[in-house]
């Protein structure tokens, strides 16, 4: 999620097909795979399976199909199960690389599930599922190395760092390729003989880990590096042609209904907008968040469906803002990227705007979320149109706001 490519998630399965075109042999599920709900994920997998393209193995070992079957599958659960069968989703797979037999398994983390409110699937405990899968691999496969693809992530607080907990509790894992928390690890995290690696977010880096086998059969690191993906890297013509083909479908299958094209220029910008990092990490007014909140109010009052009810307040949470704007031309693609998450009740990509009536007391509670909670959960920083408040950061949490007023 985060670019126009997601708008053809169901109809083209562009992301997973591109992974296959790039030679990726295996991947796992992330929380954003569920953003288009069960039907969307199922349709994407069916599209990929029926495309005829080479696609990566999809690995996840901790889906609790037994519990769902005992309770009776919901329509969405059944759709995903059927699509998993068609695609060939597995707990693990064996890959031969030269004279090395590699076992690859995938796991879906606890926080990933907490970040997927539309996910209908049930999962078993990630650590216990990985333990069970590793035991099965060791019993049935002649694996030289065991690699876990984990959408669980790491944290500065080691006691809450899911992939570090996994490494400690399943010491037979040789490598954990860690995702979900967007962490850029300059050096692997090492627990025992297990290496945890992560190359950050959004394809900014290509991670490379070179290992050599030790006398005891485990593996030691020879080299680890993160290569920045920058514009000076020579273009691969075949890859670019594949990308262009998918992007053309974005115009025809999605943007055409709104009368736009991807590269259409909407505005020329001479403003230095704040970075996403600042938007999340610095608790203050930010022009990017304020602009988007203002845009929400403008969109409502200029809609053909506007009924004349005044818009007093509009709120843009930082967690829904996915990109900033640079100076120069701002295109349709740039605007979509900046708040690209979600899907409406009509099935069209992009969160719809919703209207609600709040009392003064409730507006104070909204302000308290920003004042008290957003330092603990930075995706909850709130950028507002029409609402202003003062707060004292030294007061007790959830009792910091002293004044709230409408502008």
Question: Which residue stretches match the model-derived regions?
Answer:
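Acidic, metal/ion-coordinating pockets
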Residues: 1-231, 295
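Solvent-exposed loop/linker segments at secondary-structure transitions
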Residues: 2-8, 15, 19-22, 210-407
């Amino acid at each position: 999620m985060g670019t126009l490519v997601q708008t053809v998630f169901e109809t083209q399965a562009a992301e997973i097909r591109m992974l296959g075109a790039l030679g990726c042999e295996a991947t796992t599920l992330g929380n954003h795979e569920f953003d288009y709900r069960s039907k969307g994920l199922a349709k994407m997998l069916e599209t990929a399976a029926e495309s005829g393209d080479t696609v990566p193995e999809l690995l996840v070992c901790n889906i609790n199909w037994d519990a769902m079957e005992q309770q009776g599958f919901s329509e969405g659960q059944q759709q995903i199960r059927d699509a998993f069968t068609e695609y060939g989703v597995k707990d693990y797979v064996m890959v031969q690389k030269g004279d090395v037999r590699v076992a690859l398994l995938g796991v879906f983390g606890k926080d990933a599930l907490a970040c997927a409110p539309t996910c209908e699937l049930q999962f078993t405990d990630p650590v216990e599922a990985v333990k069970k899968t590793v035991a099965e691999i060791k019993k049935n496969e002649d694996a030289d190395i065991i690699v876990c693809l984990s959408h669980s992530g790491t944290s500065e607080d080691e006691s809450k760092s899911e992939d570090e907990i996994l490494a400690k509790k399943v010491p037979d894992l040789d490598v954990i390729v860690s995702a979900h928390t967007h962490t850029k690890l300059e050096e692997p995290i090492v627990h025992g003989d297990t290496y945890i690696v992560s190359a950050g977010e959004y394809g900014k880096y290509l991670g490379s880990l070179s290992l050599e086998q030790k006398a005891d059969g485990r593996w030691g690191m020879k080299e680890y590096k993160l290569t920045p993906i920058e514009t000076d890297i020579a273009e691969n013509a075949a890859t670019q042609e594949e990308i262009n083909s998918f992007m053309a479908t974005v115009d025809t299958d999605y943007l055409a209904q709104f009368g736009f094209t991807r590269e259409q220029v909407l505005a020329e910008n001479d403003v230095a907008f704040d970075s996403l990092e600042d938007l999340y990490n610095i608790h203050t007014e930010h022009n990017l968040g304020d602009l988007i909140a203002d845009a929400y109010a403008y969109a409502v009052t200029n809609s053909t469906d506007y009924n004349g009810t005044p818009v007093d307040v509009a709120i843009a949470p930082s967690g829904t803002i996915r990109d900033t704007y640079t100076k120069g031309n701002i295109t349709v693609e740039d605007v979509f990227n900046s708040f690209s998450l979600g899907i409406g009740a009509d099935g069209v990509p992009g969160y719809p705007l919703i209207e609600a009536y709040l009392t003064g007391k409730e507006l104070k509670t909204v302000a308290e979320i920003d004042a008290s909670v957003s330092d603990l959960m930075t995706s909850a920083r709130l950028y507002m149109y029409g609402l202003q408040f003062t707060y004292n950061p030294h007061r007790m949490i959830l009792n910091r706001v002293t004044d709230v007023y409408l502008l």
